[in-house]
Amino acid sequence: MGALVDAREINGSDLIAALHLSQRAPGLLGKGADKSAGTAEEYGQIEQLFLACLRTGDDQSAQTCLDRLSHRFGPSNERVMGLQGLYQEATAKDRSALEKCLADYDKILSENAVNVPILKRRVALLRSLNRTSDAITALIQLLDAIPTDAEAWCELADLYQAEGLGAQAIFSLEEALLIAPNAWNIHARLGEILYVGASSSDGARLASKSVQHFCRSIELCDDYLRGFYGLALASSRLLSPDYETPSNSTAPSKQTAERLHRFALQRLRDIVQSRSVDDQHWASSRSELIAAQALLNRFEQSS
């Protein structure tokens, strides 16, 4: 079976890109008559195609992808079991059906408590059922078993933040960075949570740390729009009249904050301008580009 599709296309998070890919699913899957053949990369692409089809409601093609993976790796393969669970969740008609999925996960975990894909599906399902405290408990149990899962630490941070537990969210992301210190997206996410917390009594210190993490994010990825967006916001907080520079010597001065702010805005302008005329970038990050332009407009109006 030949290569199905460019990996950059199937990894796109935008719904339009997913829809475009899923519409091609019947033709792409039809090329793979020999279900036992194929490279690991091609089966990874089938998995991404499966996710795109589920996201766009093409359940039939998603089932075909799942059958292909199950035939190749076996239905007892943990990754396949996780995808099967995702399919059952996505096609569930009501809450009762979702509760049945949860019961199925509990049964699987009673036989193998460290089935990671099922553990993660269970967490995701608890979140979708608005059982946030149960999801937090489940994630803590997962991390007790696998403390080096940076993705799980990040998800735990999101749950804590949703519950208004900012300190716990910050701790969770700091743990994630111990595992993945060069993950620019995690640095940016930590910067965002610190920025949100900067309205507290400890605001000066948190705002300063927020700027530091956004700077690290764009140092690691020099065209990361989210990092520059956050740096523009966080540096503006340091420039506000009511901000007092903390005694902490690592806090940037007003002059440094001003330079960082101007730099972030200029890079945002450059990124928005270049990506807005690129169809591929526009399709995959339209919402981010619109938000960045809105932020630029806001600062221009206030200057």
Per-region residue spans from a language model:
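Eukaryotic alpha-helical solenoid repeat scaffolds
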Residues: 1-35, 39-42, 184, 190-303
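TPR alpha-solenoid repeat register
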Residues: 45, 78-81, 117-118, 152, ...
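Structural register within alpha-helical repeat arrays
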Residues: 48-49, 84, 122, 156, ...
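Residue at a conserved register position within TPR or TPR-like alpha-solenoid repeats
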Residues: 50-53, 88-89, 126, 160, ...
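Structural motif corresponding to the intra-repeat A-B loop/turn of tetratricopeptide repeats
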Residues: 55-56, 91-95, 129, 163, ...
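Canonical positions in the second alpha-helix
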Residues: 69, 107-108, 141-142, 175-176, ...
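Short coil turns that delineate tetratricopeptide repeat
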Residues: 73-75, 112-113, 147, 180-181, ...
